[in-house]
Amino acid sequence: MRDFLTEEQVKTLKITHRSLRHKKLADRIKAVLMLHFGFTYSQISQALILDEVTLRRYLENFQEKGVDGLL
């Protein structure tokens, strides 16, 4: 999966990520951004130490509710 976010969505995610102090919430945003930039679920799973089912749920939540679905 690659290039599925608009520039505005990437900007919003990055701004939100910088403002978060809670690691789990930040990881959710990182996961969505990494998918957008072409990382595979497997690569993200290894990097963030999360299982692929969880990553897919994060993406689904984002697609349904936007940034609020990740928080």
Model-predicted segments: where are they?
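Short, basic alpha-helical/linker "hinge" immediately adjacent to a nucleic-acid-recognition surface
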Residues: 1-71
